[in-house]
């Protein structure tokens, strides 16, 4: 039996399509014949339905996953207010504990062939007074997929984030160009610049370009991603 695969999805910023790309990856992995599950370990922003608190990002991941995890595994920390997690957690008297997330991830790996773990915000978002989401990625020990929101300023954000990932000793398995701004000028040139720099400095391939979609359609977006290459990279990282 093959060892389960997993990856950590981060982004250059918040609101750049991490959940959308994570959902596209889930669809792609399912088409590749893998039982794919998703985790959103920390989610800030909840709504109540039928007496149950839910999160829109987590709902989107569940809709795309071929293996739906129990809510307590998928999102061990669901915060009500849509703001910086460590601030909301303090107000809601919640301790965001990395060890708890690692334990949930270990359980999730027993239920699927691949687990997509979506971070919160950018790569370094505080979880408490001493730890951030980069520490979470290190604790999980996962290869990272970087979602770059293609808009003005994205080149610097992409290069800085890639450097931060490498500085933590993590593998940048690849990146996705997500065109969040349909009016962006020189989009092709921006993608080419990021592609060349990340390939040269981090050997990180461009996994795909996703055109601006309104409404977002992760199932269609999955067709633009090089899932086979990503799976090969993830398997190589296990050796």
From Swiss-Prot:
Chemical reaction(s) catalysed: (7R,8S)-7,8-diammoniononanoate + CO2 + ATP = (4R,5S)-dethiobiotin + ADP + phosphate + 3 H(+)
Keywords recorded for this protein, A-Z: ATP-binding, Biotin biosynthesis, Cytoplasm, Ligase, Magnesium, Metal-binding, Nucleotide-binding
Needed co-factor(s): Mg(2+)
Positions that bind Mg(2+): 19, 57, 118
Localization annotation: Cytoplasm
Listed GO biological process terms: biotin biosynthetic process
Pathway entry: Cofactor biosynthesis; biotin biosynthesis; biotin from 7,8-diaminononanoate: step 1/2
Job description of the protein: Catalyzes a mechanistically unusual reaction, the ATP-dependent insertion of CO2 between the N7 and N8 nitrogen atoms of 7,8-diaminopelargonic acid (DAPA, also called 7,8-diammoniononanoate) to form a ureido ring.
Xref: NCBIfam families: bioD
Annotated protein name in UniProt: ATP-dependent dethiobiotin synthetase BioD
Organism placement in taxonomy: Bacteria, Pseudomonadati, Pseudomonadota, Betaproteobacteria, Burkholderiales
Record gene name: bioD
């Amino acid at each position: 039996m093959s060892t389960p695969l997993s990856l950590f999805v981060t982004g250059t910023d918040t609101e750049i399509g991490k959940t959308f790309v994570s959902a596209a990856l889930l669809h792609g992995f399912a088409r590749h014949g893998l039982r794919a599950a998703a985790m959103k370990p920390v989610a800030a922003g909840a709504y109540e339905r039928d007496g149950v608190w839910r999160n829109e990002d987590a709902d989107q991941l569940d809709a795309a996953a071929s293996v739906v995890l129990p809510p307590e595994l998928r999102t061990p920390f669901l915060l009500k207010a849509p703001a910086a997690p460590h601030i909301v957690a303090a107000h809601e008297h919640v301790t965001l504990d990395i060890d708890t997330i690692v334990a949930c991830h270990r359980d999730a790996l027993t239920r699927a062939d691949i687990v997509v773990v979506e971070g919160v915000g950018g790569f370094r978002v505080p979880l408490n007074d001493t730890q951030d989401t980069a520490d979470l990625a290190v604790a999980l020990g996962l290869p990272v997929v970087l979602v770059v929101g293609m808009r003005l300023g994205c080149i610097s954000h992409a290069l800085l984030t890639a450097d931060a990932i490498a500085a933590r000793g993590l593998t940048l398995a690849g990146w996705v160009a997500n065109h969040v701004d349909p009016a962006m000028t020189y989009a092709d040139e921006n993608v080419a610049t990021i592609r060349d720099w990340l390939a040269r400095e981090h050997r990180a391939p461009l996994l795909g370009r996703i055109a601006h979609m309104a409404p977002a359609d992760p199932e269609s977006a999955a067709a633009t991603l090089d899932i086979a290459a990503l799976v090969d990279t993830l398997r190589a990282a296990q050796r």
